[in-house]
């Protein structure tokens, strides 16, 4: 069964910021990044358990998981499973302070 993908509002800001950064670097890389994110999310919706659990807080329910964006391995999708939904919390560069950012989401 394929889960429904639910993006938290801040994810749109994440994607916009990353796409803007890539647009400044090279043409069409932003489009390739967005396509890679869409493909990754589709794959996670089919197999949500394939992401790595991230123990940000002991006993955290539901557990947050992560998955690298294919072809853009410095970027990570953070999500959790809630019933029949794959809830995406953030899409961030791996060098960002993930704990701090997710604490505020």
Stretches with model-predicted labels:
Residues 9, 34, 39-46, 105:
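Outer-membrane beta-barrel domain signature
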Residues 69-105:
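Enriched for short, Lys/Arg-rich terminal
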Residues 1-36:
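Arg/Lys-rich, positively charged N-terminal/basic patches that mediate binding to nucleic acids
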Residues 7, 15, 41-44, 86-92:
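Generic leucine side-chain signal with a strong bias for well-ordered alpha-helical environments
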Residues 46-84:
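Basic/aromatic recognition patch in beta-strand/loop cores that engages polyanionic ligands
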Residues 31, 52-56, 100:
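Short, hydrophobic secondary-structure boundary micro-motifs
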Residues 20, 27, 42, 46-50, ...:
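Generic structural signal for secondary-structure transition and capping sites
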